[in-house]
């Protein structure tokens, strides 16, 4: 089980809300979020209710300012704990509906372009474990949580285009 604490003000100040499970709508607990402390587990926090809007991946640690989790603003309206899996495996496809060249991945990939000579992935199948997809290399840019399942096109994981820069396994190493 995980534990995350949201604070309205920077530096862990102001009204706070402690959470240990998924929340589809956090609006009644705080109006803004400027700092977060993750005591245990890995979490995905979302800019809007219903797990929508910008997504941010957080591991155990302290985030005294929303820019520390690469946030664009102080709006956090839903959160989800990410289940831990000991093994990770996914298949990436260069075209929609699992067509074109297929590549298999079992570890982190800091640059999809360097490793597979592609910068667009149009479909993927997560066979084991949870992953974070980043639109830019070196784990930067917009983030998307990938849970086990099929993603026939980039819209299925919430992206506006097929640009994939890097991929990271969700591992709670602490």
Swiss-Prot record:
Q: Where is the Beta/gamma crystallin 'Greek key' domain?
A: 2-40, 41-83, 88-128, 129-171
Q: Where is this region: Connecting peptide?
A: 84-87
- Record Gene3D superfamilies: Crystallins
GO MF, one term, reads: structural constituent of eye lens
**UniProt record, GO biological process:** lens development in camera-type eye; visual perception
Q: InterPro entries, from UniProt?
A: Beta/Gamma-Crystallin, Beta/gamma_crystallin, G_crystallin-like
Under SMART domains, the record lists: XTALbg
Q: Which Pfam families match?
A: Crystall (PF00030)
- Keywords carried by this UniProt record: Eye lens protein, Repeat, Sensory transduction
Q: Does the keyword Repeat apply?
A: yes
Question: Can the keyword Protein biosynthesis be found in this entry's annotation?
Answer: no
What PROSITE patterns is this protein classified in?
Answer: CRYSTALLIN_BETA_GAMMA (PS50915)
Q: How does it assemble?
A: Monomer.
Q: Could you tell me what this protein does? A: Crystallins are the dominant structural components of the vertebrate eye lens.
Query: Which family, according to UniProt?
Result: Belongs to the beta/gamma-crystallin family.
Q: Domain comment, in the record's words? A: Has a two-domain beta-structure, folded into four very similar Greek key motifs.
- The protein depicted here goes by the name Gamma-crystallin D
List the source organism.
Answer: Macropus fuliginosus (Western gray kangaroo)
């Amino acid at each position: 089980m995980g534990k995350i604490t949201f604070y309205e003000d920077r530096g862990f100040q102001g009204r706070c809300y402690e959470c240990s499970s998924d929340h589809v709508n956090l609006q009644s607990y705080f109006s803004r979020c400027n700092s977060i402390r993750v005591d245990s587990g890995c979490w995905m926090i979302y800019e809007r209710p219903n797990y929508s809007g910008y997504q941010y991946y957080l591991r155990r640690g302290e985030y005294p300012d929303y820019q520390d989790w690469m946030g664009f603003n102080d709006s956090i309206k839903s959160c989800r704990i990410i289940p831990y899996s000991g093994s990770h495996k996914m298949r990436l496809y260069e075209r929609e509906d699992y067509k074109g060249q297929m590549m298999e991945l079992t570890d982190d990939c800091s640059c999809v372009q360097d490793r597979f000579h592609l910068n667009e992935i149009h479909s993927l199948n997560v066979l084991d474990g949870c992953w974070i997809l980043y639109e830019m290399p070196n784990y930067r840019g917009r983030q998307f949580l990938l849970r086990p399942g099929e993603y026939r096109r980039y819209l299925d994981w919430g992206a506006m285009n097929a640009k994939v820069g890097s991929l990271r396994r969700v591992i709670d190493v602490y």
